[in-house]
């Protein structure tokens, strides 16, 4: 811990309560710093509520690029703040705690991707946006969970595809496209991978009238489709959706109850979008400890001291930006990750 960290910790403590006074001070400091506050859907409810914008990582990064403010405070994990910096190279991008990593993004490095590419010369590399800037720089086309199928389908059928890093999203894309020349990296989000098929089946049986919203990063996504295919659960009530897709579906749903298979922070936005629906987590322990490192105290420290700043070197950012722009040219990324 640096002297600055020690000073900030002594001033704010690590157990700052998200009171109305705290929220007012956060907004005052943001105005003073000329900053816009962005919060990912998986953040603590108090962080979501105080933010100027809440959403998935790519949508927030695009908002950051269009925002009039010169400083962006990204309440999310590190690769998300990197993506904001890639799309807003002239802006100051801050993350309240630079230690907030991501098990999925960390499951492949740029060196590992280069070695993989060498095994399949001529292959097209498709990387999920949940990757580091260095991996994006080695990527041909990025994708989100909502447009991954369209991105892969846009690639000529005779070209090999290397899909990374999420094995469950990759399996979903391969299943939908029917593509046989598609290699999939064996990475995973530890939170989504932990939402298993047995839990999903038990919840579905216990709530036979509910709809199922399942994120494609989940280890249980295949189980959800199996339940529908076997008639154990009505197919029209099983939806494989990105976080943005979940919000759209919630606003249109006529169900009285929805079972949600993703990180539990998403429930806050779903309940705000459709307060008349009873949203329940398939696994109420599916909480990302990295996301929850962005605490009320960390946000106060960030706004007070201007820490932690995120930087991406010019060449890495240029190459990474190219892969993101190619994705956008293929089609709107829609509901994001």
Swiss-Prot record:
Domain of life: Bacteria
Example GO molecular function: quinolinate synthetase A activity
Chain residues that bind iminosuccinate: 40, 57, 128-130, 145, 215-217, 243
GO cellular component terms given for this protein: cytosol
EC number: 2.5.1.72
Keyword entries, A-Z: 4Fe-4S, Cytoplasm, Iron, Iron-sulfur, Metal-binding, Pyridine nucleotide biosynthesis, Transferase
GO biological process, one term: 'de novo' NAD biosynthetic process from L-aspartate
Parts forming coiled coils: none
Catalytic activity from the UniProt record: iminosuccinate + dihydroxyacetone phosphate = quinolinate + phosphate + 2 H2O + H(+)
Comment on bound cofactor: Binds 1 [4Fe-4S] cluster per subunit.
InterPro entries: NadA (IPR003473), NadA_sf (IPR036094), Quinolinate_synth_type2 (IPR023066)
Cofactor entry: [4Fe-4S] cluster
Residues at which [4Fe-4S] cluster binds: 102, 189, 288
Enzyme class: transferase
Subcellular location: Cytoplasm
Pathway membership, UniProt: Cofactor biosynthesis; NAD(+) biosynthesis; quinolinate from iminoaspartate: step 1/1
Biological function: Catalyzes the condensation of iminoaspartate with dihydroxyacetone phosphate to form quinolinate.
Name of this chain's protein: Quinolinate synthase
Gene that specifies this protein: nadA
